[in-house]
UniProtKB/Swiss-Prot annotation:
PANTHER family: POLYNUCLEOTIDYL TRANSFERASE, RIBONUCLEASE H-LIKE SUPERFAMILY PROTEIN. It is found in: Cytoplasm. GO terms for molecular function: nuclease activity. The lineage of its organism: Bacteria, Pseudomonadati, Pseudomonadota, Betaproteobacteria, Burkholderiales. This is Putative pre-16S rRNA nuclease. Gene3D superfamilies: YqgF/RNase H-like domain. It holds the Pfam family RuvX. GO terms for biological process: rRNA 5'-end processing. Keywords: Cytoplasm, Hydrolase, Nuclease, Ribosome biogenesis.
Length: 146
């Protein structure tokens, strides 16, 4: 899915997991991302109510979802679940969704939290931050969101 975004567009990113969904927020102008919250993935109703509240609060222009893959790049069971989640986000909230290869994002998140002395229970939100920062870092200077 693609759409041109303004230079100061706000993005929400998600690290989808069976028990928890890490969420991060970022901005195209500053090209920075920060860990936001962790949504407990209790059931579909709870998941989308919580995400809907975040979307209402942050008013993102687009969403980024981490795509879990095996180290060799092959998809696995969680790949399909994350894709379904992203497609549901697009359908429910009518926002463009972009995918980011999230291999090793949790490893990087844990290392970053340890280095800063932050709580390990924030790893899912920090992984979402890593995913979003990877996305932002990969954008060309004259960006058209895609």
């Amino acid at each position: 899915m693609s759409a041109a975004l303004s230079r100061d567009a706000t993005l929400l990113a998600f690290d989808y997991g069976e028990k928890r969904i890490g969420v991060a927020v970022g901005n195209l102008l500053t090209r920075t991302a920060r860990a936001l919250v962790i949504v407990r993935n209790l059931n579909r109703e709870h998941r989308f109510k919580a995400v809907g509240e975040l979307i209402a609060e942050w008013k993102p222009d687009a969403l980024v979802v981490g795509l879990p893959l095996h180290p060799d790049g092959a998809p696995h069971e969680m790949t399909q679940r994350a894709m379904r989640f992203g497609n549901q986000l697009n359908g429910r909230f009518n926002l463009p969704v972009n995918w980011v290869d999230e291999r090793y994002s949790s490893v990087e998140a844990r290392a970053g939290l340890r280095a800063r002395g932050d709580a390990a229970d924030r790893v899912d939100a920090e992984a979402a931050r890593v995913i979003l920062q990877q996305y932002l870092d990969g954008l060309p200077d004259h960006h058209e969101f895609n």
